[in-house]
Regions:
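Bacterial Sec-dependent N-terminal signal peptides
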Residues: 1-38
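Short internal beta-strands
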Residues: 91-99, 182
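Glycine-rich, charge-decorated loop segments at or immediately adjacent to ligand/cofactor-binding or catalytic sites
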Residues: 104-109, 180-202
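Glycine-rich oxoanion-binding loops at beta->alpha junctions
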Residues: 113-144, 156
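Glycine/threonine-rich flexible loop motifs
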Residues: 153-165
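Conserved anion/nucleotide-ligand pocket segment
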Residues: 202-273
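Glycine-rich, aromatic-lined ligand/substrate-binding cores of catalytic
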Residues: 245-325
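Conserved functional hotspot residues or short segments at active or partner-binding sites
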Residues: 292, 296-398
């Protein structure tokens, strides 16, 4: 509270490896690791879906729905969890897909139609399609007894997979269905940072009162959502989490497959907390190039930067910001991982772009209304516009983040 008052006072006184055009979703991610990183992950992380001895007895004889996408790969064999379940004789009655679809190829926010899995014949119900409300209703939820969740998150409040999971948990709580989460590591789980969502700004990119970088796995976050009565009407959801093995919050885990079209490698995933805010501005963050979320720029930033790129229409980004326009800005694709981890969620890039545009007399309209939804507070934008320093802006959320870390402690499954 003291920090927020300080911010108010300041107002008075004065945000390589992979080309998405040819990316094979089944070949996996860039696994460039520093020597230090390699020694840290000597023990292979075992994900929840590999621990069949724990969850198969829980679903025996029951009708099962699966919430997953292309990230639901089991172990080093990279067999999809759906195939494993079918082979084990589990009675699969539905597949539920998130943003980008079951195969992870659709554009951000694009409408994804219902379909049938060609391999198994199981219906795929899209929660990013025209039947979204219907699929959260009694008839669709009545298709199963247990919902299995096996999907790779990246630990950001504005990454939508957890939002879809919460909608499903709401529906399962309402209609008396069980939820079992096959937990996965959080690649950004080693820190907590960013403002906590003002629930007046609740949206599809901000659903729970948590920081931008919450530092929790989906299993831990689901436990907190239930324990803190964050589900609709405070409903209780019968929840079981199958935890990972050999994982802690300090484990730098390399994802085996890209979680979505524009996060093609670990560089993009680590920079995502700092570059996603550009989605609420007129600046491109590299969608439609071979370096999405690894660069940023705008045609009017030529006076500040010589590096350039031109967004094109590509699979997964068919209508990117500034399509066909030469953008000048910064290339962040070679910043060492250690440097990104140290800076955590940085506002330096948004501040740099804003100052550059302002110097050219182009700052009007720099921010869109989506920026406040992404950041979850209005003060971040307001302080950038008043040219406050990143240090001053970050000070505004430190107290509430410290309180959040205490509050979440009892829901954590990993050290």
């Amino acid at each position: 509270m003291k920090n927020l008052l300080l911010c108010a006072a300041l107002f008075v006184l004065l945000p390589a490896f992979c080309n998405p055009i040819s990316y094979d979703w089944e070949k996996g991610m860039d696994n460039r690791l520093s020597p230090k990183h390699e020694t840290e992950v000597a023990k292979r992380v075992v994900t929840g879906d590999e621990r069949t001895e724990l969850y198969l007895p829980l679903i025996k004889g029951k009708r099962v729905a699966l919430f997953s996408n292309q990230t639901g790969l089991v172990g080093e064999g990279h067999k999809h969890v759906l195939d494993v379940l079918v082979e084990k004789g589990v009675r699969m009655t539905a597949i539920i897909s998130p943003e980008h679809g079951f195969r992870g190829r659709a554009d951000a926010g694009a409408i994804v139609a219902d379909e049938v899995d060609e391999r198994t014949g199981i219906p795929i119900l899209s929660l990013y399609g025209q039947n979204r409300k219907k699929h959260l209703g009694e008839e669709a939820i009545g298709m199963f007894d247990v919902l299995l969740v096996d999907i790779q998150d990246v630990g950001l409040r504005y990454y939508t997979y957890y939002v879809t999971m919460c909608h499903l948990m709401d529906a399962c709580a309402k209609y008396g269905r069980e939820v079992i989460i096959l937990d996965r590591p959080n690649p950004n789980g080693h820190y907590v940072d960013g403002p906590i969502l003002d629930m007046k700004l609740k949206s599809g990119v901000g659903y729970l009162p948590i920081p931008v970088v919450h530092g929790m796995t989906l299993g831990e976050l689901a436990r907190m959502a239930v324990g803190e009565k964050w589900l609709k009407e405070g409903n209780d959801c019968k929840l079981t989490v199958i935890p990972c093995q050999n994982y802690t919050h300090q484990t730098h885990y390399t994802l085996p497959v890209a979680p979505s079209p524009n996060l093609p490698n670990m560089q993009a995933i680590y920079l995502y907390p700092s570059l996603c805010p550009f989605e609420g501005t007129v600046v491109s963050m590299g969608r439609g190039t071979d370096k999405p979320f690894q660069q940023y720029g705008h045609p009017e930033m030529r006076a500040c930067h010589t590096y350039s790129f031109t967004p094109q229409s590509v699979p997964g980004a068919t209508h990117p910001t500034l399509l066909g326009e030469k953008c000048y800005g910064k290339d962040l694709s070679t910043i060492p991982y250690d440097t990104i981890w140290k800076q955590q969620m940085s506002l330096a890039y948004v501040i740099d772009a804003y100052k550059c545009m302002k110097a050219e007399g182009k700052a009007d309209g720099f921010f869109t209304s989506f920026f406040d939804k992404l950041l979850g507070q209005t003060y971040v934008r307001e302080m950038i516009e008043k040219e406050c320093s990143e240090t001053d802006i970050r000070a505004c959320w430190q107290e509430e983040v410290a309180e959040f870390k205490k509050r979440r402690q009892k829901y954590l499954l990993y050290e």
